[in-house]
């Protein structure tokens, strides 16, 4: 093996793998807070969400047992929502009740936030409020 080739192999082995570099650049424990308020603007509950991974999305699709985006989204909500102490806010079986008994606009607001389309407050900011 030529010396330049050996040097290239040594440099590569000391460098971090691309996948590790990319994955290590994001903190999957960094939670965002959603304040659920009632029609009078009073706080009902604070929900917290970690970033969604592709594996999370696939698990929600599998548990929904359908390609219906609304059902998948509510399953994702039940799977990802946490209380402040990190415990799960919902059981997977709660998806049906949320779809049946929660006003559509409220469920939409929570799910849009979950998917990063609503207003965001990071946990650091939330604790400073």
Question: Model-derived features: where do they sit?
Answer:
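Short, charged/polar N-terminal "headpieces" of proteins
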Residues: 1-66, 128-129
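Short, surface-exposed, charged amphipathic helix/loop patches that serve as local interaction elements
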Residues: 40-129
């Amino acid at each position: 093996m030529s010396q330049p080739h050996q040097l290239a192999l040594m440099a590569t082995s000391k460098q971090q793998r691309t996948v590790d570099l990319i994955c290590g650049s994001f903190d999957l424990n960094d939670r965002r807070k959603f304040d659920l308020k009632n029609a009078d603007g009073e706080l009902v509950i604070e929900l917290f969400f970690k970033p969604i991974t592709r594996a999370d999305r696939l698990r929600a699709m599998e548990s929904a047992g359908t390609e219906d985006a609304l059902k998948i989204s509510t399953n994702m909500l039940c799977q990802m929502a946490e209380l402040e102490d990190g415990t799960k806010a919902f059981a997977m079986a709660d998806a049906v009740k949320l779809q049946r008994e929660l006003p559509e606009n409220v469920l939409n607001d929570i799910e849009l936030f979950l998917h990063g389309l609503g207003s965001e407050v990071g946990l650091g900011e939330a604790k400073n409020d």
